[in-house]
Swiss-Prot record:
Family annotation (Gene3D superfamilies): 3.40.1380.10, ATP synthase, gamma subunit, helix hairpin domain (1.10.287.80)
Protein name: ATP synthase gamma chain
Gene: atpG
Transmembrane segments: none
Single GO MF descriptor: proton-transporting ATP synthase activity, rotational mechanism
Family statement drawn from the similarity comment of this UniProt entry: Belongs to the ATPase gamma chain family.
PROSITE patterns in the cross-refs: ATPASE_GAMMA (PS00153)
Membrane topology: Peripheral membrane protein
Localisation: Cell inner membrane
Organism lineage: Bacteria, Pseudomonadati, Pseudomonadota, Alphaproteobacteria, Hyphomicrobiales
Keywords tagged on the record: ATP synthesis, Cell inner membrane, Cell membrane, CF(1), Hydrogen ion transport, Ion transport, Membrane, Transport
Any Pfam family hit: ATP-synt
Signal peptide interval: none
GO CC terms of this entry: plasma membrane; proton-transporting ATP synthase complex
Biological processes per GO annotation: proton motive force-driven plasma membrane ATP synthesis
Species this protein is from: Brucella canis (strain ATCC 23365 / NCTC 10854 / RM-666)
């Protein structure tokens, strides 16, 4: 049984930890608002660009279609771009994204495909390195980035396009977590290359309107698709930041509550033990007085 001194030390230690988790919760809550606004602001632009691409793609086919849109015609080599957070203490946020990428990689390997992985964020790299260390092609470190900007996504996009032009892969898939709410972040896989319009974009282009493009659609696509790849990566990074802050706020709230419960239990144990000690001392005093 721990002594009263040990119990006091444990209570003080848990209270100190509770102050830290409470402060981290408040910081995450403040950052979450800004991150959520940024993620929500990026969605309409990303979706409209997808709609424009889908519309233009209807007018381009065959040899005129850019390679980034039609691909190599093969799917032997797959590049997985896995975006996670640089730091932990955010519950299962990072592990859920890594698990989705890991399951996809296992499936491809079972089919005899070649898999290459680019990780964005330290936590995802640490998780995937345990099983796929030989498949890790590159790592993007954003730890020193104070404010995420489009230029960071553009650099990743240029790196991916350069690898494609060098014939390093046939299909590229982006993994990130789509922010739904503070308690809900959905791990998502999105194909970047060959560029494919999502269902929402296809629905938007299903009308009867006829568009004319200058210059020709193929030339527009050649410029727009690389831009769209960077836009989709930027949106994924913004979604990740919002999801990370939401998960961190929730995790720190749970940690603060658990610390409070532990303090209550330790305090009850301390008071009971102290009361028992006082009672014992009183009995000893009374017994001594009676003996006299």
């Amino acid at each position: 049984m721990p002594s009263l001194k040990d119990l006091r030390n444990r209570i003080a230690s848990v209270k100190a930890t509770q102050k830290i988790t409470k402060a981290m919760q408040m910081v995450a809550a403040a950052k979450l608002r800004r991150a959520q606004e940024a993620a929500e602001a990026a969605r309409p632009y990303s979706q409209r660009m997808g709609a424009v691409l889908a519309n233009i793609a209807q007018n381009v086919s065959g040899e005129d279609a850019p390679a980034l849109m039609v691909g190599t015609g093969k799917d032997n080599v797959h590049l997985l771009v896995v975006c996670t957070a640089e730091r932990g203490l955010c519950g299962g946020f990072n592990s859920q994204i890594a698990r989705l990428a890991r399951d996809h990689a296992r499936k491809l390997l079972a089919e005899g495909k070649t898999v290459k992985i680019i990780t964005v964020g330290k936590k995802g790299a640490d998780i995937l390195r345990r099983e796929f260390s030989a498949l890790l092609h590159d790592h993007v470190d954003l730890r020193e980035v104070k404010q995420l900007a489009f230029v960071h996504a553009d650099q990743i996009g240029h790196k991916i396009i350069k690898l494609f032009e060098e014939g390093a892969f046939d299909v590229c898939t982006l993994f990130y977590s789509e922010f739904k709410s503070v308690i809900s972040q959905v791990p998502t896989a999105q194909q970047l290359i060959p560029a494919s319009a999502d269902n929402e974009a296809e629905m938007e282009t299903a009308g009867d309107a006829i568009y004319e493009y200058e210059p020709d659609p193929a030339a527009i696509l050649s410029t727009l698709i690389p831009r769209n790849i960077s836009v989709q990566i930027f949106r994924a990074l913004l979604e990740n930041v919002a999801g990370e802050m939401g998960a961190k706020m929730s995790a720190m709230d749970n940690a603060t509550r658990n610390a409070g419960d532990m303090i209550n239990k330790l305090s009850i144990t301390y008071n009971r033990q102290r009361q028992a000690q006082i009672t014992k001392e009183l009995i000893e005093i009374i017994s001594g007085a009676e003996a006299l």
